[in-house]
């Protein structure tokens, strides 16, 4: 498989650590950035050669907002970046609204530890993960 460069964004340092450790087990995944807020993420995106952003849905808003506002901004300004939302929110209305933003996948934090690697593998095959 081709190497996939991934950025992780979550406002909880322990979650960032856990995601990174999980992704380090996948030989074709390279973590190129980790961010705890949307401002740091957006300010650094142009400098990073990333294929995929794995982002929490609820992070401190800062200048660029969070959730749907942040995803809309990224889709508008970085259209080639694939987005996987990692969230603990399982509200069907919110998940539907997020999927309507044409993201590449949603992974629930309360899901199986294998869900995130499966989502990335689906992306490698040109598929979405929901």
Residue ranges: model-predicted function:
Residues 93, 111-124:
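C-terminal output helix
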Residues 58-62:
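The short loop immediately C-terminal to the conserved phospho-acceptor aspartate in CheY-like receiver
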Residues 11, 86-90, 109-111:
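Conserved active-site segment of CheY-like receiver
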Residues 13-33:
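Two-component/phosphorelay signaling modules centered on CheY-like receiver
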Residues 98-104:
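As written
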Residues 34-52:
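Acidic, metal-coordinating helix/loop segments flanking the phosphotransfer/catalytic sites
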Residues 56-57, 87:
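Active-site residues of response regulator receiver
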Residues 65-79, 96:
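Short amphipathic alpha-helix used as the core "switch/output" element in two-component signaling
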């Amino acid at each position: 498989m081709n190497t996939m460069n991934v950025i992780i964004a979550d406002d909880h340092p322990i979650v960032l650590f856990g995601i990174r450790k999980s992704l380090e087990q996948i030989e074709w995944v390279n973590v190129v950035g980790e961010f705890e807020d949307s401002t740091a993420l957006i300010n650094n995106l142009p400098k990073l050669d990333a294929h995929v952003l794995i982002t929490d849905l609820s992070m401190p808003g800062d200048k660029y907002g969070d959730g749907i506002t942040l995803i809309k901004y990224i889709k508008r300004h970085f259209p080639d970046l694939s987005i996987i939302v990692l969230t603990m929110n399982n509200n069907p209305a919110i998940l539907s609204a997020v999927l309507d933003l044409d993201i590449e996948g949603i992974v629930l934090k309360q899901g199986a530890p294998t869900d995130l690697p499966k989502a990335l593998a689906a992306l490698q095959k040109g598929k979405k993960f929901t």
